[in-house]
Amino acid sequence: MDVDRVHVDELSPEMIKVRDYVPEYAVIAHRGSTFWTPEETESAYRWAREIGADYLECDMQVSKDGVVLALHDDNLKRTTNIETVFGETLPREIRKNYYMKIGYSETEAEEKVKADEANFVPNLPAYYTYEELLMLDAGSWFNNENLEEALPGLAKEKQYISTLEDLIMYSKGYRLIRDRNQPGMPRQYSIVGKTGETITSLSGTADIVKYDFGYEIDPVWEAGNKNIPGIYIEFKEPWLNPKGFEQIVYDVLANTQDMNIIEKPEPEDTPFYINNGTINVGNTNGKVILQTFSLESLVRVAEVFQGKVPMCFLLWKGTGATDLTYDDPLGYASFINLGVKYKAHFIGPCIAGAPNDYPELDQPWQDYLIHRAKMKNHPYTFDTYDQMAKYFGQYNFGVADGMFNPPYLDALFTNHSDMSINYMITHGWRKSPASQTLVDAREVLRKLGYLDNN
């Protein structure tokens, strides 16, 4: 069946309105950056904000005590020093002191620790309190594995596993308050106490605990363009997070910097760019985009957010339960139709090419099908100039006629926001009022202090 004959459902006018909350050709900083910085840390998100990305992207998980994390891996070994800090066992004394700190007697705390030990799985984030996760270093691995891009500043300024609240605050021009006179410059935080609610996840049922985190205006942001990017946040597979996780995220957005536009919408005429190119996406109704690969998560997000917040249905070709198995027009259209049915505004297909060599799900005819549904196309993940040139149509994609016109995207996830922004400015795709100034990744790292040996 050809692409003109296959049936695709279309977004309603109401859904199109929400779709258009998002700027055209938005640059989405995938995990902040996986190339220049340790992913999903303060350094990554400060860099992406200052380089001029339109969105800061993260994956979401949750700690044992209900703190929403900005964290990709479900095994902490790759991006932290957990093997050195905790090994394969539950940190018994730390956990016991934590329970006493939030109001349990010593006897009660001991019983709770025994129950936790009986159900403990090492290295999985859901089995650790956020206080325990704060003891991990989420930045040193980057220097060990990336000698050419190593950042001397990480040796003096410890990088933490970020929270969703952290991500929001970075997007608003803040940085962590740190004790800059202590080794590692530890972040400021306190445990307020139990909220009275519980959370049931892989690690069992636990108290939700309120933390108070310290933030301050970032002097680099204040001296610069004062960019306010949006955030693009991913719901992982439902087995990884607790039932009701979508509502937890809804509430965090509502209670942090007015990020939930259902609760507090912005004026519809708020511009995406101001003051000669300053990013202002984070002050518009496009300030948050939701995303997921999981059909089950897509359904749950639709129930909670009702299609009133921009949403992307991500595609992967494979044999998993909700993977795209057949990438012919009929199979591809079936996933587009699921996206329309469950209130997604965008499709996010993977792209081919080094270094990831993902399957190709953003061929010209596939982009055409997405647009037939009146959805828009947010492919992932751009790493090279060659990929930018290919999907923006700079060279022939193998299309013999003029039916499928480039570019084959409406926004893009990138690990190199600097490269993507510079390509788009140079080739006329990033137009005024967005900034027309080419960016330098290392200069931004220098301003942030991450190239400083002192």
For each predicted feature, which ranges?
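Phosphate-group recognition and catalysis centered on beta-loop-alpha active-site segments
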Residues: 1-454
